[in-house]
């Protein structure tokens, strides 16, 4: 039985290889109509392709779809004929005498009732094709190595707004509905095709490079638009400058959707993200969209512009997006924030490694922690090794050379080696191939931060009595740093009515920043009665987390 399975696996691999060798899909135009009542979708498709080798069959991935009115047209002769098409469980196979060097267009109608990927949530409809799932709602290609230009049209009731990939070109009335038409110019893998439907309001701005950025909120959340999208323009401008390659698409849009499965998804030109990140100005201090905002925008270059050939190279998507999001946060919040986040991810990675669960970055089945955080650490360490100038040049050359193509890790490393003045073999072994997290290297890097040195010194005082560390705790509380003050409060928790501890806690309530004060509210063993009346003032802090914790203490 084992050998039968292996044979089937081999044959499946050959079929995929043969498909990419015999046909190059170029463009797919579709007009789709989602039906919220039936939770179904139907549409018309025109897909253009070029035949590379003679074949009698090509296919599109399509899960449990019904098709009709299938026709084949030669682009050169404009002749059209009916052809045979077979709809299988997860594919549509088109049968004809396809000639090499010829371009064809196949048109057909389809309908489906997807069990996943197309979601109906109240008054919203949205898609999530991450990986290879777009074929559940749109005949397309699961293989991300075959990119196409996608132009979508979406038919919805007149009172709804549609957001999809590319530039919205027209909105046409169709009886009780409207057809929203979108245009893309450059190719992308099918998993990044998306649309969202809902009652949305829009605000927009233009970047320095003249890219229009559209920011959507539900009509009921218009007043939350500014805090939700705070720093978006700064992030965009920073990433374009830092990456050194202009934003590679026509538009950029961001859309919150209800009951989203992830924090965010980097659909080309149209990021969808969880409605949980839609906040007011107070909520911004507790949980905000900024990290996800920067991460998904970075994917427009890393993942969308250049796309992995297979999961072995998935860190080229997630590691890069995580790293560049960190750089954007450093630009906004400062270097201390950057090093603090690196430190926290290092702690998680070291814990995983200590448990014997460490993973190599080039393991295609690695966890998100590895792809995202270890990937970001790998880039941080590479940049330290080869220097800013070489690093930025390598990234720029890599993106420009492989724009709108598929890439491997070796493709990136070749560009690094071409500009680096040092040998990177040891870095590759330590950060890409080694399963264990290189904690010693990481902590040596962290110690280049003056803030991290102060933090490590403060942590070393945890077992010391109050009288031996009063001055250090006082300095931490009075510092501008969010994290030193919180560590000081952690060390004071449980000291009860110690005179020096009380003085320090009262100082923190009077002079500490928002997060130092929050640490008091969240600490389980605070002498609340002895800290009154200052303690009750925490109820007015600009943090719902602080207010709620104070209320229930």
Where are the regions a protein language model picked out?
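Bacterial Sec-dependent N-terminal signal peptides
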Residues: 1-22
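Acidic/His-enriched low-complexity segments
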Residues: 17-247
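Juxtacatalytic substrate-recognition/specificity segment
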Residues: 118, 128, 133-134, 152, ...
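Extracytoplasmic/secreted proteins, especially bacterial periplasmic and envelope-associated proteins
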Residues: 93, 227-234, 238, 288, ...
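Acidic/His/Gly-enriched intrinsically disordered linker/tail segments
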Residues: 312-380, 384-385, 402, 419, ...
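Beta/coil-rich, acidic/histidine-enriched accessory regions frequently appended to metallopeptidases
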Residues: 406-538, 543-553
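Long hydrophobic segments that form regular secondary structure
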Residues: 366, 375-402, 455, 465-481
């Amino acid at each position: 039985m084992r050998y039968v399975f292996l044979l089937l696996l081999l044959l499946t691999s050959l079929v995929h290889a043969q498909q990419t060798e015999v046909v190059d899909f170029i463009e797919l135009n579709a007009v789709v109509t989602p039906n919220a009542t039936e939770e179904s979708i139907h549409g018309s498709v025109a897909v253009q392709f070029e035949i590379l080798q003679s074949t009698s069959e090509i296919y599109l991935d399509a899960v449990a779809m019904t098709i009709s009115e299938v026709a084949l047209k030669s682009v050169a002769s404009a002749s059209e004929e009916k052809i045979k098409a077979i709809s299988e469980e997860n594919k549509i196979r088109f049968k004809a005498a396809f000639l090499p060097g010829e371009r064809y267009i196949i048109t057909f109608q389809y309908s489906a009732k997807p069990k996943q990927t197309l979601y109906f949530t109240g008054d919203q409809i949205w898609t999530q094709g991450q990986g290879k799932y777009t074929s559940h709602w749109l005949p397309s290609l699961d293989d991300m190595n075959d990119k196409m230009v996608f132009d979508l049209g979406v038919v919805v009731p007149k009172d709804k707004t549609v957001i999809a990939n590319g530039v919205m070109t027209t909105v046409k009335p169709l009886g009780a509905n409207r057809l929203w038409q979108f245009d893309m110019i450059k190719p992308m893998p099918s998993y990044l095709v998306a649309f969202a439907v809902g009652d949305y309001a829009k605000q927009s701005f233009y970047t320095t490079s003249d890219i229009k950025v559209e920011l959507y909120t539900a009509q009921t959340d218009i007043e939350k638009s500014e805090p939700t999208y705070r720093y978006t323009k700064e992030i965009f401008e920073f990433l374009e400058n830092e990456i050194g390659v202009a934003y590679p698409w026509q538009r950029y849009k961001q859309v919150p959707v209800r009951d989203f499965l992830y924090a965010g998804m980097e659909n080309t030109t149209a990021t969808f993200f969880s409605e949980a990140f839609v906040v007011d100005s107070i909520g911004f201090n507790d949980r905000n969209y900024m990290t996800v905002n920067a991460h998904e925008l970075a994917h427009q270059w890393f993942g969308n512009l250049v796309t992995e050939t297979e999961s072995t190279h998935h860190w080229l998507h997630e590691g890069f997006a995580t790293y560049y999001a960190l750089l954007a946060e450093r630009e906004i919040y400062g270097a201390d924030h950057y090093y603090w986040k690196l430190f926290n991810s290092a702690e998680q990675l070291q814990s995983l490694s200590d448990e014997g669960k460490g993973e190599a970055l080039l393991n295609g089945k690695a966890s998100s922690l590895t792809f995202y955080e270890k990937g970001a650490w790998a880039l941080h360490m590479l940049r330290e090794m080869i220097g800013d100038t070489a690093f930025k040049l390598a990234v720029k050359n890599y993106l420009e050379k492989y724009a709108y193509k598929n890439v491997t890790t070796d493709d990136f490393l070749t560009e690094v080696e071409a500009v680096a003045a040092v040998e990177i073999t040891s870095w590759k072994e330590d950060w890409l191939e080694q399963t264990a997290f290189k904690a010693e290297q990481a902590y040596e890097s962290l110690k280049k931060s003056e803030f991290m040195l102060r933090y490590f010194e403060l942590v070393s005082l945890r077992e010391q009595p109050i009288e031996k560390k009063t001055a250090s705790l006082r300095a931490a509380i009075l510092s501008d740093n969010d994290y030193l003050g919180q560590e000081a409060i952690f060390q004071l928790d449980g000291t009860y009515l110690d005179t020096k501890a009380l003085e320090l806690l009262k100082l923190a309530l009077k002079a500490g920043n928002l997060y130092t004060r929050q640490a008091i509210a969240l600490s389980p063993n605070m002498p609340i009665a002895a800290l009154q009346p200052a303690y009750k003032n925490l109820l007015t802090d600009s943090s719902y987390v602080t207010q709620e914790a104070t209320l229930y203490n």
